[in-house]
Curated annotation (Swiss-Prot):
Residues holding substrate: H175, G176, A177, H178
Keyword set, alphabetical order: Flavoprotein, FMN, NADP, Oxidoreductase
The organism of origin for this protein: Arabidopsis thaliana
The name this protein goes by in its record: Putative 12-oxophytodienoate reductase-like protein 2A
Binding residues for FMN: P28, L29, T30, Q103, R227
GO MF annotations, alphabetized: FMN binding; oxidoreductase activity
Superkingdom of the organism of origin: Eukaryota
Similarity field: Belongs to the NADH:flavin oxidoreductase/NADH oxidase family.
Active site: Y180 (proton donor)
Length: 269
């Protein structure tokens, strides 16, 4: 009969500075229960029910700005009320011995509700999604971001990471996967730009690497994870050569001093 010590999932693991008692992780799960984009008190029960001593939890996606919501009633980390609302939730997870990372995210053209002031969602492209949104309707055509707008979005990720640490989280996971904004720059079946953020692998990866670098510089590499999905085509985000894309990203992070020994984890799907 197998013992706990012989089951890899149940064995301890050192993840950067964090000592995990096992390798079962709560994945980030969208809940759409944060009314007004503020996490509600019921989130404390939700997360503590899933906490074990030394276990790793990754929060539901937290949006980095009011123009990045994607889905309705998602929690944010761009203002003071949101930071304060997260604090008792994170404290409750820590009181049970959990290690809690916050996933920070921008939906880009995957936007299921109206933007502030009725503006179009933003993306690497102006190509609309052809699939249906969660309400059975059509996605609104996105507005192609100008290159001079991208530093502000990079800064939104940086501020969200800083706010996550202030709220008490142990670190953040940058969501660069599944057809959302960062992935919309990475994948050549979405990104049709001809500037320094499109075309070559180097150019298509530029925005992702700028985000990662800004977040690492803000909170430290041992508090940062990155989720990537070079092989997935969710939300019409396929790539013609996913192996080359994934390899380039890993090598580029290594070149920037962001290899697996400095970024807490790299989740490739």
């Amino acid at each position: 009969m197998e013992t706990k010590q012989s089951i890899p999932l149940l064995m301890p693991y050192k993840m950067g500075p964090f000592n995990l008692s096992h390798r079962v992780v709560l994945a980030p799960l969208t809940r759409s229960r944060s009314y007004g984009n503020i996490p509600q008190p019921n989130a404390k029960l939700y997360y503590t029910q899933r906490t074990t001593p030394g276990g790793l939890l990754i929060s539901e996606s937290c949006v980095v700005s009011e123009t990045s919501l994607g889905y309705p009633d998602l929690p944010g980390l761009w203002n003071r009320d949101q930071v304060e609302a997260w604090k008792p939730i994170v404290d409750a997870v820590h009181s049970k011995g959990g290690i809690f990372f916050c996933q920070i995210w921008h939906g880009g053209r995957v936007f299921h509700q109206d933007q502030p002031n009725g503006e179009a969602p933003v993306s690497s492209t102006d190509k609309p999604l052809m699939c249906k949104n969660m309400y059975g309707g059509q996605f609104k055509p996105p507005r192609r971001l100008r290159s001079d707008e991208l530093p502000a979005i990079v800064n939104d990720f940086r501020i969200a990471a800083r706010n996550a640490i202030e709220a008490g989280f142990d670190g953040v996971e940058v969501h660069g996967a599944h057809g959302y904004l960062i992935d919309q720059f990475l994948k050549d079946k979405v990104n049709d730009r001809s500037d320094q953020y499109g075309g070559s692998l180097e150019n298509r990866c530029r925005f992702a690497l700028e985000v990662i670098e800004a977040v690492v510089n803000e909170i430290g590499s041992d508090r940062v994870g990155i989720r990537l999905s070079p092989f997935a085509d969710y939300m019409e985000s396929g790539d013609s050569n996913p192996e080359a894309l994934g390899l380039y990203l890993v090598q580029a992070m290594n070149k920037h001093g962001m290899e697996s020994s400095t970024v807490t984890w790299l989740n490739l799907e």
